[in-house]
Amino acid sequence: MQAPWFLALCFFVLPVAGQDDRLAFPSVEVEASLPGVGPLRRYEGLMKRWPELRAKWATEVEADQKSVVFLGDSITQGWGTSLPGRFPGMKSANRGIGGDTTRGMLVRLDDVLALNPSAIVLLMGTNDLEIGLEPSVAAENVKLILAAIKAHDAKVPVVLCQVFPSSPEKSRPKEKVQALNRLYADLVRGEEQVTLLDTWTLFAGPDGEADPKWFKDLLHLNPEGYARWAAALRPVLATLGFIETERVESPVEEGFVSLFNGKDLTGWGVRPTPPRKPSKNPPKPDAPVFVEVAEALNFDGKKTSDDGRYAAINGRLVVKTPAEGRRIQQLWTTEEFGGDFILKLEFRATPNADSGVFIRQPQLQCRDFPLAGPYQDLKNYKPQDWNELVVTVQDGKARATCNGEILEEAMAVPATGPIGLEGDRGQMEYRHIRLKKLD
């Protein structure tokens, strides 16, 4: 059911005859009647850009139907016309206005909804902090934006990017940015429609402020920063089906057998989990969810696990970002492997993602290593790109390398057992999973 504020919003911005006044930057008097909380930001550049861009976009509504729409401020506007090149094959539309706040984006949300978007990528909130608003104000407006999107289409995927780090010099201290990102995480926890992307850790330096490597002024991205943001988005957009829609075939080397056919989860399933001890303390809202399994199930012929977390998509075994923030569970091969062997696979992680590969039973951490650890000093790791993991098991010890660099020299493993893939936080993808017995 649409709330009255949403109807008022539609009346204000719907592209109909005589819309010029409605596309104008709202006067103080008009602002009082608009949805949202906190004042609109007012300065000459923004008040000039607002009507100019919105009038231009009003002429592009038909052409931009079903686009993946990027909504935000100057950082989003800074994509310019580069989106098609960043995400080949994906129809996209940029609805960023430099200087805008979360309330401004709420007011002009129909610039997005009028396109009946296939997906929406959100980055917003940094300018609210700059004008002295509390993080709770921005979070309330984002809550209203998400509610309006759901009212328009409850199935359209939303990617909510965490607010990027900045600097006290820009009136955006890390404490405020981190507080806002915590509110965003609380806001979307349990919301299947929204994927939260950790773009704060992606761009933060050791001090928690903007890493100058990625910014031209500790606020706006430089070209390397945009390349990094695009790389962070690609795995999520691929999982949603907008890019990388063709399966990448890779021959299986002589002596190896494939453990994943690339089409479905045949050969994989779940196994009973050990009973967990009940906690003496009440659970925290942001505590990880542990998935308990009572009996073994196999997913032969199925494209997804029963809960949808694990999915076979165009040759990739995807462990999706959990709506809970952290959801700890495992997918196992139905076959067990004794003796000596070599396991090879490739993996790709979203920023700060946490997963793992079980070698019979012990877990080898498989993460976005530079951000999530524990192997943070790897020279050959490729962030948000495909990396090769090779595990050689001999005489009860496992030697593991990532792109040729040693992760573990002699990890003890049992005599036999399955191969498993863990899900925790973020998205992890695996492909070309194969094994060669050495006996």
Predicted features by range, described:
Residues P35-G45, G80, P88-R103, E130, ...:
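Acidic/histidine-rich helix-loop elements
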Residues S67-L71, S92-G96, A119-M124, P157-Q162, ...:
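Structural recognition of the beta-strand scaffold that forms the well-ordered cores
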Residues M1-F70, T76-T81, G85-R86, L115, ...:
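N-terminal secretory targeting modules
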Residues T76-A93, T102-K143, A148, V159, ...:
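Oxyanion-hole/transition-state-stabilizing segment in secreted/luminal serine hydrolases
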Residues S74-G78, G98-T102, T126-I131, F164-P168, ...:
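Solvent-exposed loop/turn segments at secondary-structure junctions
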Residues P165-E244:
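Catalytic His-Asp segment of secreted/periplasmic serine-dependent ester chemistry enzymes
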Residues G132-S136, K170-K174, D377-L378, V413:
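Short, solvent-exposed loop/turn segments at secondary-structure boundaries
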Residues K143, I243-D439:
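Carbohydrate-interacting regions of secretory-pathway proteins
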